[in-house]
Structure formats: structure tokens, C-alpha cells
């Protein structure tokens, strides 16, 4: 074979070795084509003087192979470097303390809380306050998305839970999920879900809980949960008090009357206003915030005062809290014949937390068993020390019923208001707070507002949370229609798109476009912080073996504050056998829609200080829907408790009969019998027993049979021995304690 292969410079052919030639002549064979090449165009590929690269075009595969070889070379270099680094890291050098190490030091008990000598230290949680657990919502949301690849077994999780210690106080920044709350409270998610389930709230592990719901869970578990609000929210609320100093004018004081139920708050206000409000109130108790303006003569001048009469009943804590937040002076009413009570203490805490000046009115001094000095002594426990005892708290003994010392009390109020130097700017747009809201048959959604700065006028475009209004009308506390409202004055307005939430701040905008933007922002914020307690839960599938039934409720009230109070009171009913589920609670009259939904869901409709709309009463009778109407919150709560008792059956008081100790365990067929020695009292065959092991009740039930040798006996007395068989329990152990009781049925309340 001739080594000299001739090719054309224009056309190339593919050789047996990896060279690719581009050829135009596709139908001509290689041999024929080579013979047609002119002599001067032939090239000797094996001639060392010829640069064959000028004529050769590399194949694409060749290019890829070259690049692959280059990458392989680079990878080999990198691997070599990594190996050298690993070798350097793996070197172990003994130091002078090496010989003192012991194998036992590196062994630890199983569990996440065990101390591992070489474990990475835990990163401390952010925003910790003293010894309390704190949760920053943003941080937790991020961290909660990281899932561990290894799933902990149920046994290990239980061990972890036992090792954790529940905190006494926890601080949260806002709404959070069930899972996040469980981490903070060091409890299982199941425990939180069960607690809410029994209150009628079905949740999942990732569902968001609002602050009030989280606090309710904390109360059930004996953990105090504090809410630290974001700085942005706080600064927004403080904008109300940012006033142009050059345009300031004196304004009337806002005075909140607070104290325990039946201590005479409304009677005191009646005496000041010279009215008879107390006689008109259902059950003799205030059940909503009453806002009133009063003009009194003082030193040849007419002074205007604004009073807020807050409810004293336990259920209305939310209203009391709102009342003190907008007040300038607080009057704490304490009955001289009754003393300091739970709601008195709660009111003191609200007042002191708001840093509001306080005047104590010791009422009912005309009663025979009145003890003014004892009241003063009780109040010193809460850092309220009278001036004549060396303190700085103003205390005025009065009789609201007879009008004793009323002038002294009013003089003190005016004196304190002058010291406080209360001012506002009437030339700016109005700002203030929503005290209450309800639905009116003719006006629609109406709200009672307290103007705190600026001037409110008919036609103003107002927003309060997600509610918006072009004010169509205003009525003052005397029931008179007015065109404008000045600072420190309460006013009833209508023209609202929907009911605003009580306690919401309101502000005025120049046009509807700006107002709609503000409402849209509030709606977006509400989507994130939406409370699950006010929505119908679809999570009805959670089962609990201890739950004996479900009560579905639809609650309609006169105002939103009453609905809030009723829901809060229902959640505090001490029971864990029945799930009380509030499907929804709202202000307004009962409609046919409410009746239809109650029929579908099997709910009881509770009406509080409201009535049935036209057609609703007929629909309720036709569909056999139970509707209960109340005007006193005590009666409404009593009805719910009685309904719970009907489901759970009779409740019993336990009367101790005797105690015995297990001295031996004997087999009987497929079960076991406990051999007892009675140490106290007696054990009767009909007794209810508890089996106690290491201070824990391992069985609670009744006796199947009681024997002495082989004979049935009715009872075994102290220092005697007997055999005890319980069909439902056979895991006896020596030294178990058997406590016997007689069950005495509790008396039922009458409906």
C-alpha cells in the first residue's frame, strides 16, 4: 500500500484514522476520486515538512473527547487537593489532658435534652425576656420550615416531653401556629388541639392561632402568656396623641368608673347625672360600656366631664380593658360592706398598667356593716395607700344612694384633671376609638365612638379597621342629633359598611380612594391574623375518647362586646367532657338565615339582649330549632352549664370509705385477683375504687366481686383480708393502694 495518499485542498475524505474531510462528491468512491486529483494538488500526509492541520477539520466527537479529557484532568486535581485536606483534618494529636479522659464521659442517656460532651451548643432563642419563653413570629416561621430527615420515634418524643420543664411565663409577638405554640409551652401539639377541641375550636397542627386563643390555651395549661406588640403597631396607636402644640385647647377629662359588680358604679353615675339608669338595667348589672357627658357647676364655672360606665361582671373584662385604655382618670368603686373582690383587683391591674390617675370611691358607707378602715387596709396590698396614711392615693368615702360626699368626689375629679392639663387640637381631622358597635334595624351598622383629637363632622370619610363609612348622621349622649363632635366626646354614628371591632382606632381621610387603600391594608393584615374562634371550623374529625358529646351554639347579641364576653365565659366553664362549639357569634337580631343554619348544624340559638326578626320566630317553630332568649349573662351561662350536665349525666361527690394495700396477686382463669389487707375504714362491694401506684391513679372504676377465701362478702373491715376481682383491671402489683369511695349524686340546678 502506498503511504502517500493524495487529497484535494478543497475536498477532503475520511481516513481510517481520526481525521474528517469534507467532500462535495457524494456519489464518487474514494479510490475513483483520488485518481481524479491533479498531480500538483496532491499532498503527502506523512511528509514531516507538511503541516497537515491546514487541511484537516476535526470531528465534533473529537472536540468532545478533548474537553472530556480536560475535565477528567481537572477533577483528578481537585480530588487530590480534597484528599490532602481530609488527611490534614483527620490527624489527631494528643495533648497533655488526653490521658485524663474517660470513656464514661462520652456516654449519655438517650433523649434530646441529654448533655452531650461534644455536641454543638444550642443557639439561644431571640428576644428572651428574663426566664420566659419568647417567640418572634418571623423567626419561628422560617425555622419551622426546616424538617429533620430523621423522624424521632414516639417513645423518644415521649421521653423528650418528660424531660422538658413547662415555663411559668411565655411572651409572644403575635399570632402563631399550633406547632409553634407547642414548642414555646413545651407540650405536645395534641394537648393544644384537645384543649381547643373541647372549646368548640377544631384546629390542625399548622393552623394559626390568634393571641387571645393562645392565651386561652395557656390558662388551661397553667402558663401565663404575655403579648408584646410590634413597635409599628404601638407607634401607629401613639399617633393619636401627636398634636400640634401651637393649636392646643383644653378638653374635658374622660373618666372611667370601674369596680366589682353590684358595688354601685351605675348608681354613682345616676347620682352625678341625676338619672335612673340602674333601675333600667337587666339583672341590675351593666352589660356594655355606657358613655355620657355631664355638665356640673364648679366655682362659678360650668365644667364638662365625660364618664364611661364599664361592666363589673367577670365576663366583661374586654370592655373594662378598652375603657381604661381611653380614659384620663379612673374612679375605682369599692363597696364598704363587701371589700376588695376579683373584678376590683382586675380593674386595679388595668389602671396601673395604663398609668392612669386613680381616685378610690369607697361606696355604701351608709350600710350598717360598712368598714372604711378595713377597705383602706385591703387596698394597701395593691400599692394604693391613702394620703392620710402617708400615700398618694385619693380616697373619698361616699354613699351614691344618699348622695353623701358627692361634691367632694367631683371636686377631686376636677382637681386631678387640672393637674393633668388635658389638651387637644380641634382644627385637625378627628381620631379616636370605637367603644361599641351593633346593628340597628333602620340605620344598619352603627358605632359608638370616643373622639380623642380633632373634630368629627357629618360627611367625613372614616375608616376603623376593615370598616369604612361616609358619616350620614351623629347623635350625642343625650340623644340629640349633632353636626360635629369635639375631643373627649362620645358620639353614635351611622353610615358604616360593616360593624367595626370594639377597641379599633378610627381616622378620617380626604377622599374615598385613600380610605379604601387603608381598608385594603387592614384586610390583608386580618388575613394573616384572622382568629379561628370567629369562623366555622371544618376540622370536625378530631376524636377524643373522653368527649361525651358536642353542643353547637349560634350566639346573637345586641353589641359585639357582649358576644366577646359570652364566648370568653363559655371557654372558662370548668369541664372536659363536652365539646362546646360556637359556630359563630355576632351582633344583630336573629334572622331566618340563622334559623336555617341552626337547623342544618343542630345548633342552639342563644339571643342576648336582642330579638327575632320577622319570620325567624315562625321558622324556628316550623323547623323545631331551640331558641333561648336572655337579658342577663348569669342566666345564659347557667343554661349552658345545665345543657352540659344533661349530656355528661349526673355528677358525684366522693365520700371516702376506706383504704387497703395489695399484699399478693393470684391468677384466676385468664385474669388476676388482688389479695388485700384493709388498713383504714372498710371496703364495700358496691364501692367505687381508685387503684393508686406511686402516687398515680392507674384505675378508676367499680368492683366486680369481693371475697373472703371462697365466700362472697358485702364488706371487708379494717385489719381484715379479702380478695378483690375487677373485670376491667388485672395488672395488679404488690403494694398498690386501693382507695374506696361512696359516690353521692350532686344536686342539679333547676332550669
UniProtKB/Swiss-Prot annotation:
Principal location: plastid
UniProt-listed CDD domains: IF2_eIF5B (cd01887), IF2_mtIF2_II (cd03702), mtIF2_IVc (cd03692)
All residue ranges annotated as the tr-type G domain in the record: 250-423
Region described as G2: spans on this chain: 284-288
InterPro entries per UniProt: EF-G-like_DII, IF2_II, IF2_N, P-loop_NTPase, Small_GTP-bd, T_Tr_GTP-bd_dom, TF_IF2_bacterial-like, TIF_IF2
SUPFAM superfamilies: Initiation factor IF2/eIF5b, domain 3, P-loop containing nucleoside triphosphate hydrolases, Translation proteins
Location in the cell: Plastid, Chloroplast
Keywords carried by this UniProt record: Chloroplast, GTP-binding, Initiation factor, Nucleotide-binding, Plastid, Protein biosynthesis
GO CC aspect terms: chloroplast; cytosol
Function as written in the Swiss-Prot or TrEMBL entry: One of the essential components for the initiation of protein synthesis. Protects formylmethionyl-tRNA from spontaneous hydrolysis and promotes its binding to the 30S ribosomal subunits. Also involved in the hydrolysis of GTP during the formation of the 70S ribosomal complex.
Designated name of the protein: Translation initiation factor IF-2, chloroplastic
Origin organism lineage: Eukaryota, Cryptophyceae, Pyrenomonadales, Pyrenomonadaceae, Rhodomonas
Amino acid at each position: 500500500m502506498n503511504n502517500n495518499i493524495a487529497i484535494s485542498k478543497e475536498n477532503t475524505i475520511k481516513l481510517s484514522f481520526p481525521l474528517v474531510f469534507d467532500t462535495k462528491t457524494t456519489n464518487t468512491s474514494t479510490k475513483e476520486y483520488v485518481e481524479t486529483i491533479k498531480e500538483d494538488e496532491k499532498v503527502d500526509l506523512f511528509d514531516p515538512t507538511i503541516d497537515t492541520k491546514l487541511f484537516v477539520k476535526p470531528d465534533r466527537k473529537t472536540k468532545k473527547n478533548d474537553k472530556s479529557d480536560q475535565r477528567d484532568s481537572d477533577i483528578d486535581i481537585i480530588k487530590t487537593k480534597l484528599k490532602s485536606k481530609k488527611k490534614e483534618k483527620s490527624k489527631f494529636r494528643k495533648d497533655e489532658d488526653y490521658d485524663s479522659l474517660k470513656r464514661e464521659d462520652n456516654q449519655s442517656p438517650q433523649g434530646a435534652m441529654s448533655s452531650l460532651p461534644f455536641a454543638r451548643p444550642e443557639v439561644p432563642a431571640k428576644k428572651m425576656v428574663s426566664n420566659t419563653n419568647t417567640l418572634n413570629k418571623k423567626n419561628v416561621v422560617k425555622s419551622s420550615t426546616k424538617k429533620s430527615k430523621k423522624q424521632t420515634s414516639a417513645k423518644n418524643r415521649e421521653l423528650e416531653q418528660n424531660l422538658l420543664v413547662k415555663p411559668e411565663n411565655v411572651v409572644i409577638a403575635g399570632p402563631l401556629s399550633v406547632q409553634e405554640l407547642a414548642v414555646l409551652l413545651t407540650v405536645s401539639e395534641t394537648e393544644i388541639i384537645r384543649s381547643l377541641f373541647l372549646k368548640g375550636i377544631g384546629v390542625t397542627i399548622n393552623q394559626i392561632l390568634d393571641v387571645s386563643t393562645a392565651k386561652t390555651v395557656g390558662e388551661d395549661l397553667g402558663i401565663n402568656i404575655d403579648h408584646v406588640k410590634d413597635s409599628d403597631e404601638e407607634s401607629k396607636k401613639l399617633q393619636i396623641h401627636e398634636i400640634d402644640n401651637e393649636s392646643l385647647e383644653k378638653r374635658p377629662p374622660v373618666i372611667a368608673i370601674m369596680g366589682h359588680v353590684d358595688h354601685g358604679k351605675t348608681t354613682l353615675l345616676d347620682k352625678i347625672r341625676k338619672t335612673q339608669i340602674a333601675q333600667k338595667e337587666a339583672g341590675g348589672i351593666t352589660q356594655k360600656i355606657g358613655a355620657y357627658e355631664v355638665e356640673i357647676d364648679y366655682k362659678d364655672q360650668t365644667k364638662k366631664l365625660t364618664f364611661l360606665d364599664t361592666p363589673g361582671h367577670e365576663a366583661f373584662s374586654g370592655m373594662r380593658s378598652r375603657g381604661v385604655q381611653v380614659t384620663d382618670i379612673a374612679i375605682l368603686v369599692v363597696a364598704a360592706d363587701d371589700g376588695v373582690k376579683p373584678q376590683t383587683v382586675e380593674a386595679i391591674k388595668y389602671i396601673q398598667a395604663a398609668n392612669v390617675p386613680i381616685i378610690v370611691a369607697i361606696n355604701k358607707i351608709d350600710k350598717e356593716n360598712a368598714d372604711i378602715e378595713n377597705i383602706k387596709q385591703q387596698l394597701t396590698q395593691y400599692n394604693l395607700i391613702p394620703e392620710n396614711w402617708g400615700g398618694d392615693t385619693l380616697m373619698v368615702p361616699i354613699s351614691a344612694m344618699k348622695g353623701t360626699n358627692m361634691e367632694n368626689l367631683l371636686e377631686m375629679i376636677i382637681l386631678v384633671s387640672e393637674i393633668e392639663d388635658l389638651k387637644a387640637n380641634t382644627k385637625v381631622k378627628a381620631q379616636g376609638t370605637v367603644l361599641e358597635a351593633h346593628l340597628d334595624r333602620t340605620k344598619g351598622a352603627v358605632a359608638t365612638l370616643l373622639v380623642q383629637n380633632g373634630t368629627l363632622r357629618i360627611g367625613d370619610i372614616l375608616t376603623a379597621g376593615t370598616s369604612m363609612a361616609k358619616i350620614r348622621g351623629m347623635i350625642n349622649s343625650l340623644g340629640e342629633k349633632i353636626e360635629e363632635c369635639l375631643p373627649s366626646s362620645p358620639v353614635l354614628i351611622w353610615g358604616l359598611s360593616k360593624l367595626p371591632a370594639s377597641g379599633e382606632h378610627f381616622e378620617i381621610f380626604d377622599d374615598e380612594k385613600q380610605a379604601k387603600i387603608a381598608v385594603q391594608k387592614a384586610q390583608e393584615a386580618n388575613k394573616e391574623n384572622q382568629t379561628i374562634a370567629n369562623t366555622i371550623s371544618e376540622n370536625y374529625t378530631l376524636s377524643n375518647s373522653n368527649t361525651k358529646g358536642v353542643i353547637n351554639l349560634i350566639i346573637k347579641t345586641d353589641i359585639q362586646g357582649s358576644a366577646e364576653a359570652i364566648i370568653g365565659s363559655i371557654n372558662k366553664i370548668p369541664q372536659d367532657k363536652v365539646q362546646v362549639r360556637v359556630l359563630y357569634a355576632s351582633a344583630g337580631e336573629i334572622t331566618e338565615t340563622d334559623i336555617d343554619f341552626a337547623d342544618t348544624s343542630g345548633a342552639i340559638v342563644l339571643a342576648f339582649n336582642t330579638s327575632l326578626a320577622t319570620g325567624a320566630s315562625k321558622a324556628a317553630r316550623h323547623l323545631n330549632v331551640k331558641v333561648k332568649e336572655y337579658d342577663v349573662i348569669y342566666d345564659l351561662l347557667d343554661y349552658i352549664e345545665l345543657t352540659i350536665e344533661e349530656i355528661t349525666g349526673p355528677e358525684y361527690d366522693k365520700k371516702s370509705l376506706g383504704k387497703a394495700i395489695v399484699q399478693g396477686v393470684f391468677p384466676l382463669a385468664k385474669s388476676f385477683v388482688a389479695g388485700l389487707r384493709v388498713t383504714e375504714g372498710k371496703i364495700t362491694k358496691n364501692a367505687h375504687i381508685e387503684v393508686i401506684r406511686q402516687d398515680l391513679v392507674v384505675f378508676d372504676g367499680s368492683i366486680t366481686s369481693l371475697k373472703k377465701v371462697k365466700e362472697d362478702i358485702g364488706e371487708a373491715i379494717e385489719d381484715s383480708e379479702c380478695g378483690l376481682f375487677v373485670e376491667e383491671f388485672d395488672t395488679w402489683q404488690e403494694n398498690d393502694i386501693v382507695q374506696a369511695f361512696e359516690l353521692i349524686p350532686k344536686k342539679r340546678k333547676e332550669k
